[in-house]
Amino acid sequence: MKHFIVIDGGTQNIKAFIFDEKGNEVHGEAYPVSPYFASQPDFAEQDAEAYLRITQKVTKSVVENSGVPRDELAAVAITTHRSTIVPVDEDGRPVRPAITWLDERKTEGLKLPGGAFMSLAFRLAGLSRNNPKLQELKEYQRRSKFNWLRKYEMESYKRTYMFLTTSSYIFHALTNQFKDCSSMIVGLFPIDLKGLQWHPREVVYKIFGVEREKLPPLVSPTEIAGTVSEEGARNFGVPQGLPVIIGAGDKQSELLGAGAISNDVAEISYGTAAVIELLSNKYVTHPTMDFFTWGAAIPNHWALEGFVGRGYWMVSWFKREFAKYVEEEAEKLGTQPEELLNIEMEEVPPGSMGLILQPYWHPLENDPLSKGAIIGFSGEHTRKHIYRAIVEGIAYELRRLGEIIEKHSGSRISELRVGGGGSKSDAIMQITADIFNLPTCRLHTSNLSALGAAIDAAVALKIHDNFPEAVANMVRVKETFTPREENARIYDRMFNEVYKKIYPALSPLHYRIAEITGYPKIA
Protein backbone atom coordinates (compact mmCIF):
# COMPACT_ATOMS: atom_id res chain seq x y z
CA MET A 1 0.00 0.00 0.00
CA LYS A 2 1.42 3.36 -1.06
CA HIS A 3 1.09 6.42 1.18
CA PHE A 4 1.39 10.14 0.56
CA ILE A 5 2.74 12.80 2.90
CA VAL A 6 0.66 15.95 2.48
CA ILE A 7 1.63 19.39 3.77
CA ASP A 8 -1.43 21.64 4.07
CA GLY A 9 -0.38 25.18 4.95
CA GLY A 10 -3.27 27.28 6.21
CA THR A 11 -3.58 30.83 7.50
CA GLN A 12 -4.13 29.88 11.15
CA ASN A 13 -2.81 26.30 11.25
CA ILE A 14 -0.26 24.18 9.45
CA LYS A 15 -1.34 20.57 9.01
CA ALA A 16 0.43 17.48 7.81
CA PHE A 17 -1.19 14.17 6.92
CA ILE A 18 -0.50 10.67 5.71
CA PHE A 19 -3.10 9.44 3.20
CA ASP A 20 -3.09 6.00 1.63
CA GLU A 21 -3.97 5.22 -1.99
CA LYS A 22 -7.59 4.53 -0.94
CA GLY A 23 -7.98 8.06 0.42
CA ASN A 24 -7.89 7.01 4.07
CA GLU A 25 -6.46 9.59 6.45
CA VAL A 26 -3.96 7.39 8.28
CA HIS A 27 -2.61 10.12 10.53
CA GLY A 28 -2.72 13.89 10.75
CA GLU A 29 -1.56 16.67 13.04
CA ALA A 30 -2.13 20.43 13.14
CA TYR A 31 0.07 23.09 14.70
CA PRO A 32 -1.13 26.68 15.16
CA VAL A 33 0.84 29.52 13.61
CA SER A 34 1.19 33.05 14.86
CA PRO A 35 -1.46 35.29 13.34
CA TYR A 36 -0.44 37.95 10.89
CA PHE A 37 0.82 41.24 12.28
CA ALA A 38 0.01 44.72 11.00
CA SER A 39 2.62 47.45 11.45
CA GLN A 40 0.30 49.83 9.59
CA PRO A 41 -3.44 49.87 8.78
CA ASP A 42 -4.33 47.43 5.97
CA PHE A 43 -1.07 45.50 6.38
CA ALA A 44 -1.06 41.75 7.05
CA GLU A 45 2.41 40.21 7.27
CA GLN A 46 3.79 36.96 8.64
CA ASP A 47 7.19 35.64 9.73
CA ALA A 48 7.96 33.24 6.87
CA GLU A 49 10.90 31.58 8.62
CA ALA A 50 8.79 30.83 11.71
CA TYR A 51 6.08 29.45 9.42
CA LEU A 52 8.62 27.15 7.77
CA ARG A 53 9.98 25.91 11.10
CA ILE A 54 6.47 24.91 12.21
CA THR A 55 5.88 23.23 8.83
CA GLN A 56 9.04 21.18 9.27
CA LYS A 57 8.12 20.30 12.85
CA VAL A 58 4.58 19.10 12.08
CA THR A 59 5.72 17.12 9.02
CA LYS A 60 8.47 15.38 10.96
CA SER A 61 6.03 14.57 13.78
CA VAL A 62 3.42 13.10 11.42
CA VAL A 63 5.93 10.85 9.69
CA GLU A 64 7.32 9.65 13.02
CA ASN A 65 3.91 9.06 14.63
CA SER A 66 2.05 7.56 11.65
CA GLY A 67 3.44 4.06 11.98
CA VAL A 68 3.76 3.87 8.18
CA PRO A 69 6.96 2.11 7.02
CA ARG A 70 9.24 4.57 5.24
CA ASP A 71 9.45 2.36 2.16
CA GLU A 72 5.67 2.78 1.70
CA LEU A 73 5.95 6.59 1.50
CA ALA A 74 5.50 7.38 -2.19
CA ALA A 75 5.64 11.19 -2.39
CA VAL A 76 5.28 14.53 -0.66
CA ALA A 77 2.43 16.75 -1.90
CA ILE A 78 2.05 20.42 -0.99
CA THR A 79 -1.02 22.63 -0.91
CA THR A 80 -1.26 25.96 0.91
CA HIS A 81 -3.23 29.16 1.20
CA ARG A 82 -2.83 31.40 -1.81
CA SER A 83 -1.77 34.93 -2.79
CA THR A 84 0.88 35.25 -0.08
CA ILE A 85 4.18 36.64 -1.39
CA VAL A 86 7.49 35.49 0.11
CA PRO A 87 10.48 37.48 -1.25
CA VAL A 88 13.64 35.36 -0.93
CA ASP A 89 17.33 35.61 -1.77
CA GLU A 90 19.34 33.14 -3.89
CA ASP A 91 19.46 30.68 -0.99
CA GLY A 92 15.71 30.76 -0.50
CA ARG A 93 15.91 32.85 2.70
CA PRO A 94 13.25 35.55 3.17
CA VAL A 95 14.55 39.10 2.79
CA ARG A 96 11.54 40.52 4.67
CA PRO A 97 8.27 39.24 6.21
CA ALA A 98 5.78 37.53 3.91
CA ILE A 99 2.91 39.69 2.65
CA THR A 100 -0.18 37.57 3.21
CA TRP A 101 -3.36 37.27 1.17
CA LEU A 102 -5.22 39.31 3.81
CA ASP A 103 -3.02 42.34 3.15
CA GLU A 104 -4.91 45.27 1.61
CA ARG A 105 -2.16 47.86 1.10
CA LYS A 106 -2.25 49.87 -2.11
CA THR A 107 0.23 52.04 -3.98
CA GLU A 108 -1.15 55.40 -5.02
CA GLY A 109 0.06 57.78 -7.71
CA LEU A 110 1.08 55.14 -10.25
CA LYS A 111 0.59 55.56 -13.98
CA LEU A 112 0.18 52.81 -16.52
CA PRO A 113 3.24 52.34 -18.73
CA GLY A 114 3.47 55.09 -21.33
CA GLY A 115 5.23 55.77 -24.58
CA ALA A 116 4.34 55.00 -28.18
CA PHE A 117 5.14 51.30 -27.84
CA MET A 118 2.93 50.90 -24.78
CA SER A 119 0.08 52.84 -26.38
CA LEU A 120 0.28 50.53 -29.37
CA ALA A 121 0.35 47.48 -27.06
CA PHE A 122 -2.81 48.64 -25.30
CA ARG A 123 -4.56 49.28 -28.62
CA LEU A 124 -3.56 45.86 -29.93
CA ALA A 125 -5.00 44.36 -26.77
CA GLY A 126 -8.25 46.26 -27.38
CA LEU A 127 -7.83 48.48 -24.31
CA SER A 128 -9.03 52.03 -24.91
CA ARG A 129 -8.63 54.68 -22.19
CA ASN A 130 -12.15 54.11 -20.82
CA ASN A 131 -12.27 50.37 -21.37
CA PRO A 132 -13.42 48.57 -18.17
CA LYS A 133 -10.59 46.08 -18.65
CA LEU A 134 -8.10 48.95 -18.56
CA GLN A 135 -9.65 50.22 -15.33
CA GLU A 136 -9.28 46.71 -13.94
CA LEU A 137 -5.58 46.76 -14.86
CA LYS A 138 -5.18 50.07 -13.02
CA GLU A 139 -6.70 48.51 -9.91
CA TYR A 140 -4.33 45.54 -10.22
CA GLN A 141 -1.48 48.03 -10.49
CA ARG A 142 -2.56 49.83 -7.29
CA ARG A 143 -2.91 46.58 -5.37
CA SER A 144 0.27 44.90 -6.63
CA LYS A 145 2.64 44.16 -3.74
CA PHE A 146 5.54 44.30 -6.19
CA ASN A 147 4.76 47.94 -6.95
CA TRP A 148 4.52 48.71 -3.24
CA LEU A 149 7.93 47.16 -2.59
CA ARG A 150 9.48 49.08 -5.47
CA LYS A 151 8.11 52.37 -4.15
CA TYR A 152 8.60 51.96 -0.40
CA GLU A 153 11.18 49.16 0.09
CA MET A 154 13.36 49.28 -3.00
CA GLU A 155 16.27 47.75 -1.10
CA SER A 156 14.13 44.70 -0.24
CA TYR A 157 13.03 44.48 -3.86
CA LYS A 158 16.64 44.60 -5.11
CA ARG A 159 17.69 41.91 -2.62
CA THR A 160 14.90 39.62 -3.80
CA TYR A 161 16.11 36.88 -6.13
CA MET A 162 12.70 35.20 -6.41
CA PHE A 163 9.16 36.00 -5.35
CA LEU A 164 7.62 32.79 -4.04
CA THR A 165 4.23 31.72 -2.72
CA THR A 166 3.90 29.78 0.52
CA SER A 167 3.86 26.52 -1.49
CA SER A 168 6.98 27.26 -3.51
CA TYR A 169 8.77 28.50 -0.38
CA ILE A 170 8.12 25.14 1.30
CA PHE A 171 9.02 23.33 -1.95
CA HIS A 172 12.40 25.08 -2.07
CA ALA A 173 13.08 24.10 1.54
CA LEU A 174 12.34 20.47 0.60
CA THR A 175 14.21 20.30 -2.71
CA ASN A 176 16.52 23.33 -3.00
CA GLN A 177 14.77 24.19 -6.29
CA PHE A 178 12.72 27.19 -7.36
CA LYS A 179 9.41 26.09 -8.92
CA ASP A 180 5.70 26.70 -8.39
CA CYS A 181 2.41 25.25 -9.61
CA SER A 182 0.37 27.07 -12.26
CA SER A 183 -2.76 26.29 -10.24
CA MET A 184 -1.25 27.86 -7.12
CA ILE A 185 -0.88 31.27 -8.77
CA VAL A 186 -3.95 33.41 -8.17
CA GLY A 187 -4.66 37.06 -7.49
CA LEU A 188 -2.02 39.73 -7.93
CA PHE A 189 0.51 37.91 -10.09
CA PRO A 190 1.16 38.48 -13.83
CA ILE A 191 -0.24 35.13 -14.96
CA ASP A 192 -2.13 34.22 -18.11
CA LEU A 193 -4.94 32.28 -16.47
CA LYS A 194 -6.27 30.97 -19.76
CA GLY A 195 -2.89 29.56 -20.80
CA LEU A 196 -1.91 28.71 -17.20
CA GLN A 197 1.59 30.14 -17.61
CA TRP A 198 3.28 33.43 -16.85
CA HIS A 199 1.85 36.11 -19.08
CA PRO A 200 3.45 36.37 -22.55
CA ARG A 201 3.10 40.19 -22.78
CA GLU A 202 5.92 42.28 -21.32
CA VAL A 203 3.55 45.18 -20.63
CA VAL A 204 1.77 43.09 -17.99
CA TYR A 205 5.00 42.78 -15.96
CA LYS A 206 5.44 46.55 -16.13
CA ILE A 207 1.90 47.03 -14.80
CA PHE A 208 2.51 44.65 -11.89
CA GLY A 209 5.99 46.05 -11.27
CA VAL A 210 8.04 42.85 -11.39
CA GLU A 211 10.61 41.32 -13.74
CA ARG A 212 9.80 37.95 -15.25
CA GLU A 213 13.11 36.50 -14.07
CA LYS A 214 12.09 37.07 -10.43
CA LEU A 215 9.24 34.56 -10.80
CA PRO A 216 9.82 30.78 -10.63
CA PRO A 217 9.12 28.31 -13.46
CA LEU A 218 5.60 26.86 -13.36
CA VAL A 219 4.62 23.19 -13.41
CA SER A 220 1.26 21.43 -13.57
CA PRO A 221 -0.34 19.96 -10.41
CA THR A 222 0.38 16.40 -11.58
CA GLU A 223 4.00 16.97 -12.51
CA ILE A 224 6.78 15.60 -10.31
CA ALA A 225 8.40 18.96 -9.61
CA GLY A 226 11.48 17.67 -7.79
CA THR A 227 12.83 15.29 -5.16
CA VAL A 228 13.64 15.73 -1.48
CA SER A 229 17.22 16.93 -0.95
CA GLU A 230 19.55 15.78 1.81
CA GLU A 231 18.88 18.99 3.75
CA GLY A 232 15.13 18.70 3.14
CA ALA A 233 15.13 15.11 4.41
CA ARG A 234 16.92 16.17 7.58
CA ASN A 235 14.66 19.17 8.29
CA PHE A 236 11.31 17.61 7.38
CA GLY A 237 11.99 14.05 8.53
CA VAL A 238 11.06 12.50 5.17
CA PRO A 239 13.13 10.13 2.99
CA GLN A 240 15.73 11.71 0.72
CA GLY A 241 14.92 11.35 -2.98
CA LEU A 242 11.15 11.15 -2.45
CA PRO A 243 9.18 12.78 -5.33
CA VAL A 244 7.60 16.15 -4.49
CA ILE A 245 4.39 17.42 -6.11
CA ILE A 246 3.35 21.06 -5.79
CA GLY A 247 -0.41 20.75 -5.85
CA ALA A 248 -2.96 23.43 -6.60
CA GLY A 249 -3.95 26.13 -4.14
CA ASP A 250 -5.89 25.00 -1.10
CA LYS A 251 -9.33 25.89 -2.44
CA GLN A 252 -8.84 24.24 -5.83
CA SER A 253 -7.43 21.20 -4.03
CA GLU A 254 -10.58 21.07 -1.89
CA LEU A 255 -12.70 20.95 -5.04
CA LEU A 256 -10.80 17.85 -6.16
CA GLY A 257 -10.73 16.37 -2.66
CA ALA A 258 -14.53 16.62 -2.58
CA GLY A 259 -14.70 14.52 -5.73
CA ALA A 260 -16.50 17.38 -7.49
CA ILE A 261 -15.18 16.60 -10.97
CA SER A 262 -18.43 17.13 -12.90
CA ASN A 263 -19.99 20.51 -13.64
CA ASP A 264 -23.16 19.87 -11.63
CA VAL A 265 -21.48 19.26 -8.26
CA ALA A 266 -20.18 22.32 -6.41
CA GLU A 267 -17.88 22.36 -3.41
CA ILE A 268 -18.16 24.71 -0.46
CA SER A 269 -15.19 25.39 1.77
CA TYR A 270 -15.93 26.69 5.24
CA GLY A 271 -12.46 27.86 6.22
CA THR A 272 -10.89 31.21 7.13
CA ALA A 273 -12.22 32.26 3.74
CA ALA A 274 -15.52 30.73 2.65
CA VAL A 275 -15.65 29.64 -0.97
CA ILE A 276 -17.99 28.01 -3.47
CA GLU A 277 -16.29 26.37 -6.46
CA LEU A 278 -17.34 24.58 -9.61
CA LEU A 279 -15.07 22.74 -12.05
CA SER A 280 -15.05 23.84 -15.70
CA ASN A 281 -13.31 22.40 -18.75
CA LYS A 282 -13.45 25.80 -20.41
CA TYR A 283 -12.11 29.20 -19.40
CA VAL A 284 -15.06 31.26 -18.16
CA THR A 285 -14.76 34.70 -16.57
CA HIS A 286 -17.06 37.31 -15.05
CA PRO A 287 -16.81 40.86 -16.43
CA THR A 288 -16.89 42.53 -12.99
CA MET A 289 -15.14 39.80 -10.99
CA ASP A 290 -18.17 38.53 -9.09
CA PHE A 291 -16.35 35.22 -9.32
CA PHE A 292 -12.77 34.28 -10.08
CA THR A 293 -11.35 31.77 -12.53
CA TRP A 294 -8.20 29.95 -11.45
CA GLY A 295 -6.34 26.92 -12.68
CA ALA A 296 -7.89 23.78 -11.17
CA ALA A 297 -6.17 20.85 -9.46
CA ILE A 298 -6.90 18.90 -12.65
CA PRO A 299 -4.60 20.05 -15.49
CA ASN A 300 -6.23 22.04 -18.31
CA HIS A 301 -9.34 22.70 -16.21
CA TRP A 302 -10.45 25.75 -14.25
CA ALA A 303 -12.06 26.34 -10.89
CA LEU A 304 -14.84 28.96 -10.96
CA GLU A 305 -14.72 30.45 -7.49
CA GLY A 306 -17.03 32.66 -5.46
CA PHE A 307 -15.10 34.05 -2.53
CA VAL A 308 -16.04 35.43 0.91
CA GLY A 309 -12.72 36.79 2.13
CA ARG A 310 -13.44 36.54 5.84
CA GLY A 311 -15.75 33.56 5.98
CA TYR A 312 -15.37 31.37 9.04
CA TRP A 313 -12.74 33.82 10.25
CA MET A 314 -15.89 35.57 11.47
CA VAL A 315 -16.49 32.72 13.93
CA SER A 316 -13.07 33.41 15.47
CA TRP A 317 -13.90 37.12 15.51
CA PHE A 318 -17.25 36.44 17.19
CA LYS A 319 -15.67 34.21 19.85
CA ARG A 320 -12.97 36.78 20.59
CA GLU A 321 -15.24 39.81 20.77
CA PHE A 322 -18.55 38.48 22.11
CA ALA A 323 -18.24 34.96 23.48
CA LYS A 324 -15.21 34.57 25.73
CA TYR A 325 -17.48 32.79 28.20
CA VAL A 326 -17.90 29.99 25.64
CA GLU A 327 -14.17 29.29 25.57
CA GLU A 328 -14.10 29.05 29.36
CA GLU A 329 -17.14 26.75 29.41
CA ALA A 330 -15.73 24.56 26.64
CA GLU A 331 -12.48 24.12 28.55
CA LYS A 332 -14.42 22.96 31.62
CA LEU A 333 -16.40 20.45 29.53
CA GLY A 334 -13.42 19.26 27.51
CA THR A 335 -14.93 20.26 24.18
CA GLN A 336 -14.49 22.92 21.49
CA PRO A 337 -16.12 26.38 21.77
CA GLU A 338 -17.64 25.96 18.30
CA GLU A 339 -19.54 22.88 19.44
CA LEU A 340 -21.22 24.86 22.22
CA LEU A 341 -22.01 27.74 19.87
CA ASN A 342 -23.56 25.33 17.37
CA ILE A 343 -25.73 23.78 20.10
CA GLU A 344 -26.94 27.25 21.12
CA MET A 345 -27.55 28.16 17.47
CA GLU A 346 -30.03 25.32 17.07
CA GLU A 347 -32.24 27.02 19.66
CA VAL A 348 -32.75 29.89 17.18
CA PRO A 349 -35.32 29.46 14.37
CA PRO A 350 -34.41 29.75 10.67
CA GLY A 351 -34.03 33.41 9.74
CA SER A 352 -32.70 34.30 13.20
CA MET A 353 -35.94 36.06 14.15
CA GLY A 354 -35.39 38.65 11.42
CA LEU A 355 -31.68 39.26 12.02
CA ILE A 356 -29.73 39.11 8.76
CA LEU A 357 -26.05 39.63 8.04
CA GLN A 358 -24.07 40.77 4.99
CA PRO A 359 -20.64 39.12 5.47
CA TYR A 360 -18.40 41.74 3.91
CA TRP A 361 -15.97 42.01 6.83
CA HIS A 362 -13.49 41.79 3.96
CA PRO A 363 -14.65 44.03 1.09
CA LEU A 364 -15.82 42.67 -2.23
CA GLU A 365 -13.07 42.42 -4.83
CA ASN A 366 -15.04 44.64 -7.21
CA ASP A 367 -16.07 47.15 -4.52
CA PRO A 368 -13.29 48.02 -2.05
CA LEU A 369 -15.68 50.34 -0.16
CA SER A 370 -18.21 47.60 0.64
CA LYS A 371 -18.75 46.81 4.30
CA GLY A 372 -20.29 44.17 6.51
CA ALA A 373 -23.71 44.79 8.00
CA ILE A 374 -26.14 43.25 10.47
CA ILE A 375 -29.71 44.52 10.27
CA GLY A 376 -32.98 43.66 11.97
CA PHE A 377 -32.04 43.98 15.64
CA SER A 378 -34.63 44.03 18.39
CA GLY A 379 -34.51 43.60 22.15
CA GLU A 380 -35.18 39.88 21.71
CA HIS A 381 -31.89 39.17 20.01
CA THR A 382 -28.97 37.62 21.88
CA ARG A 383 -25.48 36.41 21.08
CA LYS A 384 -26.81 33.11 19.79
CA HIS A 385 -28.99 34.99 17.26
CA ILE A 386 -25.94 36.91 16.04
CA TYR A 387 -23.96 33.69 15.71
CA ARG A 388 -26.70 32.03 13.67
CA ALA A 389 -26.99 35.17 11.52
CA ILE A 390 -23.25 34.88 10.77
CA VAL A 391 -23.64 31.26 9.64
CA GLU A 392 -26.74 32.09 7.59
CA GLY A 393 -25.19 35.25 6.09
CA ILE A 394 -22.14 33.40 4.81
CA ALA A 395 -24.39 30.75 3.23
CA TYR A 396 -26.64 33.42 1.65
CA GLU A 397 -23.60 35.05 0.06
CA LEU A 398 -22.29 31.73 -1.25
CA ARG A 399 -25.71 31.01 -2.77
CA ARG A 400 -25.64 34.43 -4.46
CA LEU A 401 -22.21 33.70 -5.89
CA GLY A 402 -23.22 30.17 -6.90
CA GLU A 403 -26.15 31.52 -8.91
CA ILE A 404 -23.83 33.91 -10.75
CA ILE A 405 -21.43 31.05 -11.56
CA GLU A 406 -24.33 28.96 -12.87
CA LYS A 407 -25.53 31.80 -15.10
CA HIS A 408 -22.15 32.48 -16.70
CA SER A 409 -20.98 28.88 -17.03
CA GLY A 410 -24.24 27.42 -18.28
CA SER A 411 -24.08 24.80 -15.53
CA ARG A 412 -26.79 23.79 -13.08
CA ILE A 413 -25.69 22.80 -9.59
CA SER A 414 -27.61 19.77 -8.28
CA GLU A 415 -25.48 18.82 -5.27
CA LEU A 416 -23.13 20.43 -2.76
CA ARG A 417 -20.12 18.90 -1.07
CA VAL A 418 -18.69 20.68 1.94
CA GLY A 419 -15.24 20.79 3.51
CA GLY A 420 -13.36 22.86 6.06
CA GLY A 421 -13.98 23.22 9.76
CA GLY A 422 -17.62 24.20 9.33
CA SER A 423 -18.42 20.86 7.70
CA LYS A 424 -17.92 19.09 11.04
CA SER A 425 -21.12 20.66 12.40
CA ASP A 426 -24.47 18.97 11.67
CA ALA A 427 -26.22 22.29 12.33
CA ILE A 428 -24.11 24.17 9.77
CA MET A 429 -24.51 21.39 7.21
CA GLN A 430 -28.29 21.45 7.62
CA ILE A 431 -28.48 25.26 7.37
CA THR A 432 -26.42 25.06 4.17
CA ALA A 433 -28.74 22.43 2.69
CA ASP A 434 -31.80 24.50 3.63
CA ILE A 435 -30.48 27.83 2.28
CA PHE A 436 -29.39 26.32 -1.04
CA ASN A 437 -32.34 23.89 -1.11
CA LEU A 438 -29.92 21.23 -2.34
CA PRO A 439 -28.65 17.90 -1.00
CA THR A 440 -25.46 18.73 0.88
CA CYS A 441 -22.80 16.09 1.46
CA ARG A 442 -20.19 15.58 4.12
CA LEU A 443 -17.20 13.55 2.97
CA HIS A 444 -15.27 10.87 4.84
CA THR A 445 -12.71 13.53 5.81
CA SER A 446 -13.08 17.25 6.40
CA ASN A 447 -9.49 17.80 5.23
CA LEU A 448 -10.41 18.03 1.57
CA SER A 449 -7.53 20.23 0.43
CA ALA A 450 -5.04 17.69 1.76
CA LEU A 451 -6.97 14.83 0.14
CA GLY A 452 -7.02 16.74 -3.16
CA ALA A 453 -3.23 17.12 -3.04
CA ALA A 454 -2.93 13.38 -2.32
CA ILE A 455 -5.11 12.65 -5.37
CA ASP A 456 -2.83 14.81 -7.52
CA ALA A 457 0.15 12.82 -6.21
CA ALA A 458 -1.59 9.49 -6.91
CA VAL A 459 -2.24 10.51 -10.53
CA ALA A 460 1.25 11.99 -10.94
CA LEU A 461 2.81 8.68 -9.88
CA LYS A 462 0.34 6.60 -11.96
CA ILE A 463 -0.89 4.81 -8.85
CA HIS A 464 -4.28 5.71 -10.30
CA ASP A 465 -4.37 6.13 -14.07
CA ASN A 466 -6.68 9.15 -14.22
CA PHE A 467 -8.82 11.44 -12.09
CA PRO A 468 -12.13 9.55 -12.35
CA GLU A 469 -10.34 6.41 -11.19
CA ALA A 470 -8.54 8.26 -8.40
CA VAL A 471 -11.74 9.93 -7.16
CA ALA A 472 -13.65 6.64 -7.28
CA ASN A 473 -10.99 5.03 -5.10
CA MET A 474 -10.14 7.92 -2.77
CA VAL A 475 -13.34 9.96 -2.14
CA ARG A 476 -16.41 8.76 -0.25
CA VAL A 477 -19.61 10.55 0.76
CA LYS A 478 -20.17 9.91 4.46
CA GLU A 479 -23.50 11.66 5.01
CA THR A 480 -26.04 13.65 2.99
CA PHE A 481 -28.18 16.42 4.50
CA THR A 482 -31.53 16.82 2.74
CA PRO A 483 -33.24 20.24 2.73
CA ARG A 484 -36.11 20.65 5.17
CA GLU A 485 -39.03 21.94 3.16
CA GLU A 486 -40.36 24.53 5.63
CA ASN A 487 -36.90 25.88 6.43
CA ALA A 488 -36.01 26.05 2.73
CA ARG A 489 -39.18 28.04 2.05
CA ILE A 490 -38.30 30.61 4.75
CA TYR A 491 -34.73 30.90 3.58
CA ASP A 492 -35.72 31.24 -0.06
CA ARG A 493 -37.90 34.23 0.74
CA MET A 494 -35.26 35.78 3.02
CA PHE A 495 -32.65 35.33 0.29
CA ASN A 496 -34.67 36.68 -2.63
CA GLU A 497 -36.78 39.31 -0.88
CA VAL A 498 -34.26 40.60 1.68
CA TYR A 499 -30.64 39.46 1.34
CA LYS A 500 -30.20 40.24 -2.36
CA LYS A 501 -31.52 43.76 -1.75
CA ILE A 502 -29.21 44.69 1.13
CA TYR A 503 -26.09 45.46 -0.91
CA PRO A 504 -27.83 47.66 -3.53
CA ALA A 505 -29.52 49.57 -0.70
CA LEU A 506 -26.39 50.07 1.40
CA SER A 507 -23.79 50.55 -1.34
CA PRO A 508 -24.33 54.34 -1.66
CA LEU A 509 -23.93 54.64 2.11
CA HIS A 510 -20.63 52.74 2.00
CA TYR A 511 -19.29 55.52 -0.24
CA ARG A 512 -20.60 58.23 2.09
CA ILE A 513 -19.04 56.54 5.12
CA ALA A 514 -15.65 56.42 3.38
CA GLU A 515 -16.03 60.04 2.25
CA ILE A 516 -16.83 61.25 5.76
CA THR A 517 -14.41 59.14 7.80
CA GLY A 518 -11.59 58.73 5.29
CA TYR A 519 -11.62 54.96 5.73
CA PRO A 520 -11.16 53.13 3.53
CA LYS A 521 -9.44 55.62 1.28
CA ILE A 522 -11.38 56.43 -1.89
CA ALA A 523 -9.28 55.89 -5.01
Regions found by a protein language model. Give the residues of each.
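A ubiquitous short alpha-helical element
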Residues: 43-46, 442
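Glycine-rich phosphate-binding/catalytic subdomain of phosphoryl-transfer
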Residues: 42, 57-332, 518-522
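Short acidic, glycine/proline-rich loop/turn micro-motifs
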Residues: 37-43
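Phosphate/oxyanion-binding active-site loops and adjacent basic polyanion-contact surfaces
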Residues: 48-55, 391
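Glycine/Thr-rich phosphate-binding loops that ligate phosphate moieties of nucleotide
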Residues: 1-30, 37, 74-112, 155, ...
